[in-house]
Regions:
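Mobile, glycine-rich extracellular loop/lid and propeptide segments
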Residues: 2-5, 70, 87-90, 95-98
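Acidic-basic catalytic patches of nuclease active cores, encompassing PD-(D/E)XK
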Residues: 4-77, 81-85
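Acidic, metal/cofactor-coordinating or nucleic-acid-engaging core segments within structured domains
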Residues: 41-47, 51-56, 108-110, 120-337
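Short, well-ordered loop/turn elements at secondary-structure boundaries
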Residues: 88-89, 109-111
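Conserved catalytic cores of phosphodiester-cleaving nucleases, focusing on short active-site segments
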Residues: 92, 114-120
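Short loop/turn segments at secondary-structure transitions that flank enzyme active sites
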Residues: 95-100, 121-125
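Short loop/turn motifs that connect adjacent beta-strands in outer-membrane beta-barrel proteins
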Residues: 102-107
Length: 339
């Protein structure tokens, strides 16, 4: 079931995100993501904010919160049926699990996920009014930015590849089939490439401003509001009915990790989890010993220029070997234990 959180939680999350960046903005999306998910970053702060919202333990009942961060070493890629060139699935993902258990049963009340595409606003107009796809405002046809937007805004059928060097897809013909558009499955998150000045400051109520995956939509949802809407399965605060929910539920059982099935949104979520290091997954759900992910102080990025053959593919493999483009996966689990 969704968490029951007050609207003020969003402001508390945004306040802590500002503290992570020490109220200084500017830098590439990968560098800014590294700051967000550093050892003293969002993970610990989110746990401190959410833990007090759990129901106090009573005789025969308790609630526990576990938050983990996993880094997928090389980002998975999608190859749309309508496009011969692969595209990275996203820069980050958030998962939420709600587990009920007692002496006789273990039942997953809810499993939910959202994929996030991070972009650094560089153009003057984007610094003042960031809008999807952020950088650039109008991408070249067949560019990586154009392909990212096509994937997250349409979710046409695609083949999923484990990494850029993978010759064969992990899953063929994945069909997410969102019921409405813009889809709830994937959102954009924007951060300023350079420090906002003057009137530009008003656009950045949070270091990360978010929007659904639809061309031209303003990034006017703070990351705190996005996380709140995701965890509560509700509309974004002040977003109105025009915005979709953040994320979509999926069917989950730990046995699916060893025996995946299907080719829909459920399968895509399971495949992302399968790529996560086992010891980074919530121990309460997966039984693995959870560890702390260490983020490199400097993450370098080169644009995706690959194709299905020749120099582009070789370049991708070389780039990923030297500067692996990792995908951050934030996992939030609530366990409700009776008895």
């Amino acid at each position: 079931m969704p968490l029951r959180l007050e609207p003020e939680i969003a402001a508390a999350i945004d306040s802590q995100i500002w503290e992570i960046y020490r109220h200084r903005l500017g830098g590439s999306e990968l560098r800014q993501l590294a700051k967000l998910f550093k050892r003293s970053g969002l993970l610990t702060r989110l746990e401190n904010i959410l833990s007090p919202t759990l129901r106090p333990p009573s005789r025969g009942y308790r609630e526990d919160l576990e938050i983990r961060l996993a880094w997928i070493d090389k980002r998975p890629l999608a190859k749309l049926e309508t496009n011969p060139r692969r595209v990275e699935l996203g820069d980050a993902a958030i998962f939420f699990f709600d587990l009920f258990q007692n002496a006789k049963t273990k039942r997953y009340l809810q499993s939910r996920a959202v994929i996030l595409q991070a972009k650094a606003a560089k153009e003057k107009k984007q610094l003042a009014r960031p809008a999807v796809p952020v950088n650039p405002t109008i991408p070249r046809a067949m560019s990586s930015t154009a392909r990212e937007l096509e994937l997250l805004s349409t979710w046409r059928k695609f083949d999923l590849y484990k990494a850029s060097g993978s010759r064969a897809p992990t899953v063929r013909g994945i069909s997410v089939a969102p019921p409405r558009f813009p889809p709830a499955n994937g959102w954009y998150m924007a951060t300023p490439k350079s420090r906002p000045r003057g009137a530009e400051i008003h656009a950045w109520k949070s270091p990360w401003m978010c929007a659904p995956a639809a061309s031209g939509l303003l990034c006017n949802v703070t990351l705190g509001n996005l996380i709140l809407a995701f965890l509560t399965s509700s509309m974004v605060n002040g977003g109105g009915s025009s915005l979709p929910e953040v994320g979509t539920n999926f069917k989950f059982d730990p046995q699916y990790l060893s025996m995946p099935r299907g080719n829909d949104w459920d399968r895509l979520c399971i495949e992302i989890l399968r790529l996560c290091p086992r010891n980074r997954l919530p121990q309460s759900l997966f039984g693995a010993r959870a560890g702390v992910a260490v983020v490199a102080s400097v993450l370098r990025s080169l644009p995706y220029i690959g194709s299905e053959d020749g120099l582009g593919d070789w370049f991708l493999r070389f780039r990923d070997f030297i500067w692996p483009r990792r995908m951050a996966v934030l996992l939030i689990a609530v366990t409700r234990t009776e008895g």
